């Protein structure tokens, strides 16, 4: 999947995460979280795992975490990535 435009998913509410995805030459992940020292590596690993499953190798991803669970982070990364591409989405494979 190729990222062709800027897209955002999520909110800045407590227990949520806002993920911003935009075109970039390589894969760049920025994590802003009050619990980054404790969970930063896990957050980055989850983001990388979701991007790899979607076949994304070049994008800038900015994660504004407000204490979201891992399943919420996965859903937000998927949603932002799908909004940021012009490719057709195979919804049966996603769901």
Curated annotation (Swiss-Prot):
Localization (cell): Cytoplasm
Residue numbers bearing the O-(phosphoribosyl dephospho-coenzyme A)serine modification: 14
Keyword tags: Cytoplasm, Phosphoprotein
Cystine residue pairs: none
Pfam families xrefs: ACP (PF06857)
Gene Ontology cellular component annotations, sorted alphabetically: cytoplasm
InterPro entries: CitD, Mal_deCO2ase/Cit_lyase_ACP
Biological function: Covalent carrier of the coenzyme of citrate lyase.
Subunit details: Oligomer with a subunit composition of (alpha,beta,gamma)6.
Protein family: Belongs to the CitD family.
Entry-linked NCBIfam families: citD, PRK13253.1
Protein name: Citrate lyase acyl carrier protein
């Amino acid at each position: 999947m190729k990222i062709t435009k800027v897209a955002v998913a999520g909110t800045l509410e407590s227990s949520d995460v806002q993920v911003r995805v935009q075109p970039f030459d390589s894969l760049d992940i920025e994590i802003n979280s009050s619990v980054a020292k404790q969970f930063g590596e896990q957050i980055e690993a989850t983001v990388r795992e979701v991007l790899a499953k979607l076949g994304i190798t070049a994008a800038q991803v900015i994660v504004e975490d407000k204490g979201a669970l891992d399943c919420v982070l996965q859903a937000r990364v998927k949603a932002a990535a799908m909004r940021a591409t012009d490719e057709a989405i195979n919804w049966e494979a996603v769901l």
